[in-house]
Design a protein with these regions (language model features):
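Conserved NAD+-utilizing ADP-ribose enzyme module
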Residues: 1-101
């Protein structure tokens, strides 16, 4: 799927629920000291990608849709990059959320 981020589409992310609060699931690349939130263009890709993410045992994870700009605002506020990711874990695009209008 070709994803036009300028149109503020719905994208799919993995969300963790803890104590009734939902939180986007971020990942960390320790060698490069990068923290990022993977997002997917399609629900099926996110469901497949969920199993490739590092997760904590005993936590509840699910795939949810969110507007791209809302995700970008939250990522910028918490110091994360955004990685448009394929179902197989391949990174399609790296985005600095501070550059999103």
């Amino acid at each position: 799927m070709d994803l036009s981020l300028a149109e503020n589409p719905m994208v799919w992310v993995v969300v963790r629920t803890e104590g009734g609060a939902e939180q986007f699931v971020g990942q960390q690349h320790t060698d490069l000291d990068i923290t990022f939130i993977p997002f997917f263009a399609e629900k099926e890709a996110a469901q497949d990608g969920l199993h490739r993410l590092k997760r904590e045992k005993g936590r509840r994870y699910e795939v949810q849709a969110v507007r791209f700009r809302e995700l970008a605002r939250d990522a910028a506020r918490h110091g994360f990059l955004l990685f448009h990711t394929a179902a197989d874990g391949h990174i399609l695009n790296k985005i600095d959320p501070h550059t999103v209008a």
